[in-house]
């Protein structure tokens, strides 16, 4: 089932969604290759990548980031690796060095930052969805627990990796 551009399967695995966003991003890569052949500068190519390709890889990240496997994360990173190699014109370059050279962060770091920004905006008192995260009730005693928000009891690993418990853990770590 596709909801707002995110493919949600009944078993809450994100293989289909990852395949979908990677295919969508790869379909935009032909334009990046064509622009490189036409001789556009690296700044323009990078700008195109950021505005036309990477947006597909970051759509609704807080929903599916916590459920990614290592393989799915590597599939998404591969898209950026290909884009960087096209922009730089070097196909045998180290990915992390190329990211720093071009001024980008690896996508797994970027996804984490997007989740942190989302959770901070959502938990602010002015947000319409601030009740999504419940404050911990400590009563009258002061405790050493740093958790300000109540974490969900997760009996199964699938629920532990779902968005709400993950985002609550992120919020408590900030």
Predicted feature locations:
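Hydrophobic/basic alpha-helical segments
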Residues: 1-174
